[in-house]
Amino acid sequence: PSDITLSLAKGARMAGALIYEDTKVTGIEVDKGVIKGIETSQGYISCGVVIACCGQWTRDFARCVGVNVPLVSVEHQYMVTEPIAGVSPDMPTLRDPDRLTYYNEEVGGLVMGGYEPNPIMWAKNGIPKGFHYQLLESNFDHFEPIMEQALGRVPALQTAGVKMLTNGPESFTPDGNFILGEAPELKNFMSAPALTPME
């Protein structure tokens, strides 16, 4: 994901975009339904379009201008295994939509995760102030059904050592589809917050 992000940023800069990192947007100036600019921790920036692509923070951010972005943060877990014979760095990512699982190579082992049919909601009243990509406590009981599905696809997981089980919040839409485009409530307010693949 970081390589994709850096590539998109490079392309945006080549097209004239300015990217401000570590800069908090504190407000959006709207005059008669037209976006005029944004207030930031670094000062005012004049603009006619706002693109809200801030993941699980998008819902709260959009509310400041009356835009509803239907997102929910849920706990998302994946495990990382010890090296497995036959797994190589050029192994393609494997997704099994029937089992709702995914697999990709990680230092000779596998990252394996899945999308639970009964996810655990997190921060339903808003992301806690000061939360910045921290991890949540692992929940082995909740991960067990995903593991059972994975064993049916990748039997080598039965004997693979597990380095870690990681749990972190991710944002999803109620129907699992993407939200991408202009908000109906405000012209030129675009959103692209939940692009997590579930299918």
Where are these regions (language model features)?
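A structural signal for short hydrophobic beta-strand segments in well-ordered beta-sheet cores
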Residues: 25-28, 94, 102-103, 180
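C-terminal catalytic lobe of FAD-dependent flavoproteins
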Residues: 7, 98, 137-199
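Short, hydrophobic/aromatic-rich segments at coil-to-beta transitions
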Residues: 34-38, 89-92, 188
